[in-house]
Amino acid sequence: MKYMISFAGKSKPSSEEEIITKKYLRRLSNIIINQCEVKTKNIELRLKEEGSKLLKLTPSNGKLILLDEQGTNFSSNELAEIVSDWENSNFSTINFVIGGAYGNGKEIKEKADKTLALGRLTWPHQMVKMMVAEQIYRIDTILKGHPYHK
């Protein structure tokens, strides 16, 4: 299984969160980070453009998990089970998508295969990328029976 973390907005590569994210990325050879940036000031148009760009990053034989505060709170084991089911159904890629500063537009919410919340709190992009990278690593270790997840 290949993994992607795709996000809308700018990245601050020197932040502590980015350093930790890279630590998990080094442990996984099958992960790609994608960034898309939309500069329009109109919020409605921005949500639509960001959603469209982020949707295009998910391959046709892939699945999209949208990070959204109104999503479902899955446990790590539940996420690992979802990933395992998709892998057994011959889906090759899972794209974890993080919306922009104004959240996610209607189109991407409707097209997401799963919507995941990291609790009810709002988190900065850098921290969400770090948490998603860690969860991907955790899922990978759960599926391989590695003792990282206890």
Task: Give residue spans per PLM region.
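N-terminal beta1-alpha1 ligand-phosphate binding loop
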Residues: M1-L25
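Loop/turn-to-beta-strand initiation segments
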Residues: K2, F91-V97
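Short glycine-rich anion-binding loops that position phosphate/pyrophosphate groups of nucleotides
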Residues: K10, E69-T72, G100-G103
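Short glycine-/acidic-enriched loop or helix-start segments at secondary-structure transitions
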Residues: S15-E17, S75-N77, G105-I108, M127
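Short, surface-exposed alpha-helical segments at coil->helix boundaries
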Residues: E18-K22, G51-S52, K106
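S-adenosyl-L-methionine/SAH cofactor-binding core of RNA-modifying enzymes
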Residues: N30-T93
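Proline/glycine-rich low-complexity loops and linkers
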Residues: G99-G100, K111
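Structured adenosyl-cofactor binding patch, chiefly the S-adenosyl-L-methionine
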Residues: E107-K150
